[in-house]
Amino acid sequence: MSISDNSREELGELPAGRPLQSEFNDDLDYPRLGSVTFRRGTLTENQQTMWNEKWPELGRVLEDELIDIDAWFGRTGAKTIVEIGSGTGTSTAAMAPLEADTNIIAVELYKPGLAKLMGAVVRGGIDNIRMVRGDGIEVLNRMFADGSLDGVRIFFPDPWPKARHNKRRIIQSGPLNLIAKKLKPGGVLHVATDHADYAEWINELVEVEPLLEYKGWPWPECPQLTDRQVITKFEGKGLDKDHTINEYLWQKKQ
């Protein structure tokens, strides 16, 4: 049964209240959102007009149905990369024109962030970006078949800095295993953070998933674009505080 219905009166809206969460029974650690609900926000009048016109073509919301990637993008055989937590889409929109042969699917909870990305897509005539509104773990688990993705990107995820909230971090054993299952052999996971404690956390996990081979950073032979092209809003804030950007690359074993 579908969690969402894109035909609802307000396009791209998610159910109110606490989001549904999958039950994982593999003894791995998965983030739990706890009291966090789907982030809501107000669009400008122009953004709302654009959203109403373009969302049926460019967007979907979290649902229990696998995405037919070829049908959605109107082409077959193209590589597909999912970006989890795309924010306002600064990197997404900057990278996509340089990888026109690749389908880019941006996953984000925050509606104004997706609207901003949609504006960049429309203004720039970018035709290889689509959007899914929902929690990244649930979207991966419910909407993509195993072995269907060429890449997953997670740029500057929420660090959940308080120790009692560390279990909500997306980079941990469970998500790494889930991502590995969704990647094709040879597929790439690219993570970036400017949070020192989160970087230490990730450093302890780089070898935890047996399906992934850690390649470090940089990895000149990486088969995908790794230059994020621009400094994102959150990256800029970190650099202003003299934070170090740490990046990580893994490849699914053949």
Curated annotation (Swiss-Prot):
CDD domains: AdoMet_MTases. Substrate binds at K162, D194, T232, K233, F234, E235. Residues 1-25 are annotated as: Disordered. Its EC number is 2.1.1.33. GO terms for molecular function: tRNA (guanine(46)-N7)-methyltransferase activity. InterPro entries: SAM-dependent_MTases_sf (IPR029063), tRNA_(Gua-N-7)_MeTrfase_Trmb (IPR003358), tRNA_methyltr_TrmB_bact (IPR055361). S-adenosyl-L-methionine binds at E83, E108, D135, D158. One of its GO terms (cellular component) is tRNA methyltransferase complex. Residues 1-11 have a biased composition (Basic and acidic residues). It catalyses: guanosine(46) in tRNA + S-adenosyl-L-methionine = N(7)-methylguanosine(46) in tRNA + S-adenosyl-L-homocysteine. Residues 164-169 are annotated as: Interaction with RNA. The active site is at D158. Pathway: tRNA modification; N(7)-methylguanine-tRNA biosynthesis. It comes from the Bacteria. Keywords: Methyltransferase, S-adenosyl-L-methionine, Transferase, tRNA processing. Pfam families: Methyltransf_4. PANTHER family: 3-DEOXY-D-MANNO-OCTULOSONIC-ACID TRANSFERASE/TRNA GUANINE-N 7 - -METHYLTRANSFERASE, PENTACOTRIPEPTIDE-REPEAT REGION OF PRORP DOMAIN-CONTAINING PROTEIN. Catalyzes the formation of N(7)-methylguanine at position 46 (m7G46) in tRNA. HAMAP family: tRNA_methyltr_TrmB. NCBIfam families: tRNA (guanosine(46)-N7)-methyltransferase TrmB (TIGR00091). Belongs to the class I-like SAM-binding methyltransferase superfamily. TrmB family. This is tRNA (guanine-N(7)-)-methyltransferase. It comes from Corynebacterium efficiens (strain DSM 44549 / YS-314 / AJ 12310 / JCM 11189 / NBRC 100395). The lineage of its organism: Bacteria, Bacillati, Actinomycetota, Actinomycetes, Mycobacteriales. The gene is trmB.
